[in-house]
Amino acid sequence: MSIGTIFRVIKMLYSVLWYTASLVSFMFNAFWLCCTLASAGIPWATLLLVIVCIASKFFKLSSPNEKQLNSLLGGNVADDLSFWPIAHRGGAYDAPENSAAAIKKCTKRGFRNVLLDAGITACNEIVIVHKSTLQKAGLCGSISRVTMETLQNINISELHPLGSQFEPEKILTLGNLLRLLEGTNLTIFLLISDSSSKMIEKLKSTIKLHESFTRRVIVCSKSPVAIYQLRKVYPELICGLWCDKSPSRIILKTSTLLTSIYGAIFRNIIAPVIGISLVFISKDEFNLHISELWRNVGVRPIVYNVNSPNEKRYFQKVMKTQYLTDSLRSEPQLLVKT
């Protein structure tokens, strides 16, 4: 090996070592800068958190009492098998979703808890329908862009796999629903998909006109602001917060610390301020620890969507938690005739 070759090898090794040392130095300096900024920001973050906690005490709404909640949910008796399931959209696998037929079927089977979707039309009418129903009917866009006249032309029975077993069904208005509840012991979980000011004002006027609304309906929303606006006017109204899966939640999962902080803010600040009684959590994000954390702040968790008999038995016997289900035929302890 010639002297020139040896010199080039030594020069190459020197370059590699120099670049490696430079990279390590850069990473160390960047880490040191992050630590410095974090240490400087911690006092300010702590101060901000204290201010938010103090301010929340002045805006906090009182929660409805547990007795009122139990009367709506049918108590909290583990031996009462009808207590655990909440029929999602009236049991969308068993009957046309969000329909009068689905509600009547739940009543006939002895189940009293039903979750229905609600939106508001372009003509300012609250309707019991989900946007997926409109898509099946060939209508594009949100419910707020469709008129009531257009919706009345839809036969939702035709859109269901078992539609031939049912009479033609029209989309219900909220007024139709409240009249349908008369003479029944049903409790309706009304999941509002639209948290616009138009929807909130229409709901307020509906509650004002129907004294039984707060005794028969639990309003659920993904928006804490919408819940706060409703409960500020009607503090006796029982509300539930729907925790949806979103890209931001997926990002938070990458950091255990961020996830813990995010959950703590919702449980210890937002939930007490808006005075919710229920929270809806995906079964994939639920465990005994999460359940205890929510119950400790006076909020009852409900999981969604549970359709397997084995899963239902697990949530009944182990988790002691109510669940949304798309089918009442799969209740593990009951043989339900269709």
Q: Where are the regions a protein language model picked out?
A:
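Phosphate-group recognition and catalysis centered on beta-loop-alpha active-site segments
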Residues: 2-338
